[in-house]
């Protein structure tokens, strides 16, 4: 478990983000006050789920679907995928690829928003890279698409569809004997029987 602390709006952003009106810092804490990872622990290219809530993020300052949101660490852009952005309901779920997480450390992650001139850069393929072992990633909300470049999208069987439900980290699908989701693995992988 990682601990993220969001610290409101900061006026300073790296030069790359000068055109963004707002920025804030979140801290990934792996010391004993947070995830309590040993100093020897190192995790590479970790997809970190960041949740935004109206209690600490003003959705009216960003574009309606979060298209102007960006993440960075030490001035370098971070790949991200917006899984859900509900400005009206006041919550969002964004996966951010963290290049390196070290144990017994505190790492700042900056979020930038408030730039009407930019279009969205949300890209699941850059967060969940197949070259790093992700064969498929399904967030299992209303959308059953694979977030990886393998495009192993899920398809509900018409006679036995899955149903939406609430999961541990957000929207989910309910499975069972009469609730089946098909994923065509044979399109990408050789299946040997």
Please provide the spans of the model-predicted regions:
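Extracytoplasmic low-complexity segments
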Residues: 14, 117-179, 183-193
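Bacterial N-terminal signal peptides
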Residues: 1-9
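Alpha-mannosidase-like glycoside hydrolase catalytic domains involved in N-glycan trimming
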Residues: 14-142
């Amino acid at each position: 478990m990682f601990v993220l602390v969001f610290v409101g709006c900061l006026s300073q952003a790296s030069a790359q983000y000068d055109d963004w009106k707002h920025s804030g810092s979140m801290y990934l804490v792996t010391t004993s006050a947070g995830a309590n990872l040993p100093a020897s622990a190192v995790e590479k290219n970790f997809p970190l789920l960041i949740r935004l809530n109206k209690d600490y993020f003003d959705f009216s300052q960003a574009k309606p679907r979060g298209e102007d949101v960006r993440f960075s660490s030490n001035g370098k852009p971070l790949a991200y995928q917006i899984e859900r952005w509900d400005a009206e309901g006041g919550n969002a779920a964004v996966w951010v690829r963290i290049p390196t997480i070290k144990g017994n450390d505190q790492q700042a992650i900056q979020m930038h928003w408030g730039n009407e001139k930019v279009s969205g850069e949300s890209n699941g393929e850059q967060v969940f890279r197949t070259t790093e072992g992700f064969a498929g990633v399904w967030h299992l909300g209303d959308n059953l698409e694979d977030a990886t470049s393998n495009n192993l999208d899920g398809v509900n069987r018409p006679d036995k569809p899955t149903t939406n439900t609430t999961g541990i980290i957000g929207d989910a699908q309910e499975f069972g004997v009469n609730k089946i989701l098909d994923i065509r693995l044979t399109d990408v992988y050789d299946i040997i029987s």
